A protein has these predicted regions:
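Short beta-alpha connecting loops at secondary-structure transitions
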Residues: 175-180, 200-205, 250-260, 285-286, ...
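Short beta-strand segments
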Residues: 62-65, 103, 117, 142-143, ...
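Cofactor-binding beta-sheet edge motifs in enzyme active sites
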Residues: 340-341, 445-463
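Conserved acidic/glycine
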Residues: 1-47, 54, 235-236, 241-385, ...
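Cofactor-binding active-site loop characterized by glycine-rich and histidine/acidic residues
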Residues: 23-27, 33-163, 181-187, 192, ...
Length: 474
């Protein structure tokens, strides 16, 4: 598929901006300026740049610990990125997120995750919100080859398939999960062909080839927006720096292997050679583009070094939302006595009637009405999209609820039995409890998790959950 001159230029600008910024951050990490880990995207720039060139601010992306490139390609200013890694108040998350937790929802950057897997589920949640709100945009999780051996990958693809979510799963197979070769860690030697097992489109492409990426993402976008068909795209690529700055790099691979990718398969060199071969840009024009970016990154770096740290007095800001600030629980003309089941059913019905952003999801809550009849009749009244029966995958649908809340919906998670929430602890503790804080309040978390347990039936010590930070248990 042909790409126009201006679009090619934009892709190249994104790619070189990522490369220059990452090299600058790598040096800064060596000098101790980066607070925390620093995982660079060097060698993989073609994927983020080409994919994000086809998106707008309403298309949502969810990234990984190696997320600088996706953030920049989506439109994050280098100054905000560098500031965030330096822990400065001028960072995109006001210094609370750091390298692995970058947020700017106004441009569709919904966050990066230091934990492998959750962003896949969150992207499914955003896809669910898109369908709920009848929008025509897409949700895209970027993840590495290591994530495909994680349960979140299976649960995410399955949910996207059965609910026709407009999600494009992009696996950046850079050959190593930290230092473990993909050839060792996976029984299946490819990722793209796994899509067909879930009833979705699957592609295996060269992740360093701008033209192949462009052709595939255009097709996947068409399927997602017009037909609500999810896709899985495996981009085969290679990171040419260590897993994280400061880590030993040549115990599990050789310098010769790395240099082969740096010289012969570098995506930036490939597109530069294409420009020269096709006479799209000459050496002087390419240098001018690079010089402009070099100057911008240098200025951003210096400004970030000089920027202030957050005030100590703000350390606990954004831990909680303002609780019931605009509500009046006493504004009722009459009262009645009900048991917990009846009261839950009445409140769900009342709130769903007045707020179409609310949906309920859980096992057996549809026509069956749930184990304790708390949703009985709501399926017929509000439909399958708002009263959603789920597979048995607590981690999966709680992670989806997290992403749905991040993107504007108000999910109510209904656990068949409350002790089943143990299976979703990772999503509750590492994601739901922390996203609002790490995003400096840019992303809210209007999510309710509820469930019942039979009287006299001891299955778990639920009160231990009271010790979880940022959670309110009723």
């Amino acid at each position: 598929m042909k790409i126009g001159k201006e679009k090619l230029k934009n892709i190249f600008i994104k790619m070189y901006t990522i490369r220059k910024c990452e090299e600058t951050l790598a040096k800064a990490a060596q000098q101790g300026l980066v607070l925390g880990a620093c995982h660079t995207y060097v060698g993989q720039e073609a994927i983020a740049a080409t994919v994000c060139e086809e998106l707008d601010n309403h298309d949502l992306i969810f990234s990984t610990h190696r997320g600088h490139g996706h953030a920049l390609a989506k439109g994050l200013d280098p100054f905000e990125l560098i500031s965030e890694l330096f822990g400065k108040k001028t960072g995109c998350s006001k210094g609370r997120g750091g390298s692995m937790h970058l947020f700017k929802p106004e441009i569709g950057l919904m966050g990066t995750s230091g934990i492998v897997g959750p962003n896949i589920l969150q992207a499914c949640g955003a896809g669910y919100s898109i369908n709920l709100f009848k929008k025509n945009n897409v949700s895209i999780p970027f993840f590495g080859d290591g994530a495909v051996n994680n349960g979140a990958f299976h649960e995410g693809l399955n949910m996207a398939s059965i609910w026709n979510l407009p999600v494009i799963f992009i696996c950046e197979n850079n050959q190593f999960a930290t230092e473990v070769p993909f050839s060792y860690s996976s029984g299946s030697k490819n990722v793209g062909n796994r899509g067909f097992n879930y009833g979705i489109e699957g592609y295996e492409i060269d992740g360093n080839d701008v033209f192949e990426i462009h052709k595939t993402i255009k097709l996947a976008l068409k399927n997602a927006k017009e037909k609500k068909i999810p896709s899985l795209i495996e981009c085969k690529t290679y990171r040419t720096r260590s897993h994280a700055e400061g880590m030993i790099d040549y115990t599990y691979r050789t310098k010769g292997e790395v240099n082969k990718w740096r010289s012969g398969k570098c995506p930036i060199l490939k597109i530069e050679n294409y420009f020269l071969e096709k006479k799209i840009f000459n050496d002087k024009e390419i240098k001018k583009i690079k010089d402009t970016i070099d100057q911008k990154i240098a200025i951003s770096y210096q400004k970030a070094k000089e920027a202030p740290f957050p005030e100590k007095s703000t350390a606990l800001d954004f831990v909680f939302s303002d609780y019931c600030k605009n509500s009046n629980t006493n504004n009722h003309s009459s009262t009645s006595q009900k048991n917990m089941i009846q009261a839950t059913h009445e409140v769900l019905d009342y709130e769903m009637k007045r707020n179409d952003k609310i949906f309920i999801l859980g096992e057996g809550i549809g026509k069956r009405g749930g184990n304790f009849s708390t949703t009985l009749g709501l399926f017929e009244k509000y439909g399958q999209l708002r009263v959603c029966d789920t597979p048995i995958c607590e981690r999966g649908f709680v992670g989806l609820a997290c992403g749905a809340a991040m993107s504007g919906a108000r999910p109510v998670v209904d656990f068949m039995f409350i002790d089943f929430l143990n299976d979703a602890f990772g999503e509750i503790i590492n994601q739901i409890s922390k996203v609002q804080y790490m995003s400096s309040g840019k992303i809210k978390m209007p999510i309710i998790m509820r469930g019942c347990i039979g009287i006299g039936h001891s299955a778990a010590v639920s009160y231990t959950h009271l010790t979880l930070p940022t959670n309110r248990e009723v």
